[in-house]
Amino acid sequence: MELAKKEYSKLELKQEVNISISNREKKIGNVSQTINNKAAGQQTYIITEKYTPPTASHIERSKVKEVTVLYRGSTAPTLASGLTPFHKDSLDVWTDWGVNDIPTAIQITNGGGSTVTPQLKTSAETLKQTMKLYPNAQIYVYGHSLGSMNAQYAIADLDKKDIKRISGGFFYQGPNIYSNLTPKQQDTVKAINALDRLFNFIDRKDYVPIGYGIGDPTIGHLIEVESKKAGMVEQHMWGGYQFDKEGNILTNKEGSLQLAKYVTAQQLAAINIMRTSFTKSGGGLSSSEEIFLDAAEALAITQGMKQTIQGEIRALKDVFDKEIENAEELWRDTLSDARDIGSNLYESEILAALAWGGATEPEIVIDTVQDCEKSLVEATKIEQEYDKLLERINEAIKSQLKTDQELAKQIGSMYG
């Protein structure tokens, strides 16, 4: 999400792009292209590990291993841009809203359509050209709001043979454009969805993400965010998102599971690349390298399990809250009915009659609350055990790197 927010920054060519992860700065790369198609309204940043513009040699561009594509969302309309002739944002606002957002939204609310807006077309072309420019790179695509629609469409419009190069797609708070796709594009989406690399985040308290009915197909896994209420604009701009202590977005149970699977798979793939790098000279792994790689794999798997457990715990809390609410309502209704029937009795006599039949507040409410709390305590203990295990694995990795300085140089700051 932090990386997606960068699409609204005024990034310059060659600028280094960093994000904060667990209170540590991580370099994503450098801006190699800034695309500003005024006719269509498309604004996109292309980020590579180091500055490698389209004018670089084919050899240099072929060395690029990762590319991040950031599709910017709509320019927010203001009173000034709406009423002032030749205002600097007037054209952006019109092309974003009048030419792209509103026509697409109308199609979605009417069950879809085949008319493709200019910005979707140019966004698809941008992704294809980027993949040609950097032929050996894995591609990560991000987009928010209108940028989400651009990202969804660009991936759906790829040739099937190219979809394996999409290592991740992250779409936030945009309408579901699946119904606007052609049968061929929908077929491509089904194929890439099977790879579990695309994630479509929505906050249902935001009015912009339309088209996500129960059972409706989507581009990527639908990730429903557990959000808090915010102002209308803030809600759309991630203002309702909530996070755990590790900085992960709080989502529904299914979302936590899908994200944990993806992150674990990405980490294990990176470890396999590292393993290959260690043995490229033709020799086997040193004992130090073997210990490090085993610990790194254990860390990745354990982190994934912990994230899954956290999703289960949040789901349990939702179930228990509902059970407690139902129990409290049952007791209120039971007591109200008893008072109506025994209107001539004292309150103590009504309660005694209910107790004789086994209907007491402790039986109906308090026991339910205690059972739920007991189950949550047990689940939380499991989460705490994962925390302890993660701490031990991290310490083992740091100890190994401290002992083997050569290995530490190879790893860099990955686990530092």
PLM feature segments, named:
Residues 1-9:
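Short Lys/Arg-enriched alpha/beta "domain-start" segment
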